[in-house]
């Protein structure tokens, strides 16, 4: 394999029902940083039905080129068909790097493509960089149960591939004046490429604001002791007053106190709210991996030596069952809520 033939950092853009996912923009922002470092260009691959109008949004967020596969057969995600499209693109265009969102779709599509192309894939990256040779991407991710951060490279194969969780990187500001090239491609598909059939989309319900969309998250850990603070008690009350969502550590979810949809951390969701209030969360690497993208972290913990105090913006040493109700009442007073 002549590595010099492979050019371009490409984001596999993800859209749902005609709307681009924010993770696609976040990856484009990071792709531009990497491309500027190694002197390469940024591209995006867009797949679906009636998706061509979305190409300009990708250009506005950093793509120099957008390759569009607009096909009625590709309206709904299909693992084998989408993988065939991406693999065909690789053989035709020879990209250097594929960046994929660590979403439900990305976690399915990325490994399938990597396996087909006989290359490596680093999953759930929290940081991207460039090796000293200015050619090899350095993928950083938690390892050994989240106790260390591993740096992984793929020096001898192409494409270099990795998945990145939503909200790990900031979404860049759109530049409406940006220009780029939109290239329409034809998907070369047969019935054999569709090993599954889309039957029905069932959207999961859920009360309140989703944690991945929330501007404020009030999260609890093992120290909450029961489900009551999450469902009706102090965490829920504070989140409701702030118009936010309730989050939880893995320990709280494993204890059965709250649904896994609320889990923040290495094995849960990665979030990037304006305010993250961590209640009785010690600050081990696992939950920190999901919250460090927050603009402001406020920690409440009775253990003054808890690791969370090393990463938070504001720390309160005290009993969360005493401190948080006082904080909630102060917010109510400030807002004029009875």
Curated annotation (Swiss-Prot):
Q: Which InterPro entries match?
A: DHS-like_NAD/FAD-binding_dom, ETF_a/b_N, ETF_a/FixB, ETF_alpha_N, ETF_asu_C, ETF_asu_C_CS, Rossmann-like_a/b/a_fold
- The question of whether Membrane is a record keyword is answered with no
Which molecular function GO terms apply here?
Answer: electron transfer activity; flavin adenine dinucleotide binding
Q: Which cofactor does it need?
A: FAD
Q: Does the keyword Disulfide bond apply?
A: no
Which UniProt key words apply to this protein? Electron transport, FAD, Flavoprotein, Transport
Positions bound to FAD? 275-303
Q: List the disulfide bonds.
A: none
Quote the cofactor binding remark.
Binds 2 FAD per dimer.
**Biological process (GO), any one:** fatty acid beta-oxidation using acyl-CoA dehydrogenase
**What role is this protein assigned?**
The electron transfer flavoprotein serves as a specific electron acceptor for other dehydrogenases. It transfers the electrons to the main respiratory chain via ETF-ubiquinone oxidoreductase (ETF dehydrogenase).
Similarity field: Belongs to the ETF alpha-subunit/FixB family.
Oligomer and partners: Heterodimer of an alpha and a beta subunit.
| Name of the featured protein | Electron transfer flavoprotein subunit alpha
Q: Which organism is it from?
A: Megasphaera elsdenii
């Amino acid at each position: 394999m002549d590595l010099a033939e492979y050019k371009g950092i490409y984001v596999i853009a993800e859209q749902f029902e005609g709307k681009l996912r924010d993770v696609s923009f976040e990856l484009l922002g990071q792709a531009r940083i990497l491309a500027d470092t190694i002197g390469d260009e940024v591209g995006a691959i867009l797949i679906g039905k009636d998706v061509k109008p979305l190409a300009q949004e990708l250009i506005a967020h950093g793509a120099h080129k957008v390759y569009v596969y607009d096909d009625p057969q590709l309206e709904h995600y299909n693992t084998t068909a989408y993988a065939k499209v991406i693999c065909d693109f690789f053989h035709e265009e020879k990209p250097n790097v594929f960046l994929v969102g660590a979403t439900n779709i990305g976690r399915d599509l990325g490994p399938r493509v990597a396996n087909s192309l006989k290359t490596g894939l680093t999953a759930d990256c929290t940081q991207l960089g460039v090796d000293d040779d200015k050619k090899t991407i350095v993928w950083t991710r938690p390892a050994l149960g989240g106790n260390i951060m591993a740096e992984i490279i793929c020096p001898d194969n192409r494409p270099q591939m990795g998945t990145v969780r939503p909200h790990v990187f900031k979404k860049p500001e759109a530049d409406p004046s940006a220009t780029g090239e939109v290239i329409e491609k034809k998907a070369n598909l047969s019935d054999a490429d569709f090993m599954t059939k889309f039957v029905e989309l069932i959207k999961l319900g859920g009360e309140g604001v989703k944690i991945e969309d929330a501007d404020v998250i009030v999260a609890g850990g093992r120290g909450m002791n029961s489900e009551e603070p999450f469902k009706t008690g102090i965490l829920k009350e504070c989140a409701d007053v702030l118009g936010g969502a309730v989050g939880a550590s893995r320990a709280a979810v494993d204890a059965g106190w709250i649904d896994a949809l609320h889990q923040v951390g290495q094995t849960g969701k990665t979030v990037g709210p304006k305010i993250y209030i961590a209640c009785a969360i010690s600050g081990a690497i696992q939950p920190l991996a999901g919250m460090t993208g927050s603009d402001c972290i406020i920690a409440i913990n009775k253990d003054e030596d808890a690791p969370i105090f090393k990463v938070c913006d504001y720390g309160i040493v005290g009993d969360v069952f005493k401190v948080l109700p006082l904080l909630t009442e102060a917010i109510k007073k400030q807002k004029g809520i009875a």
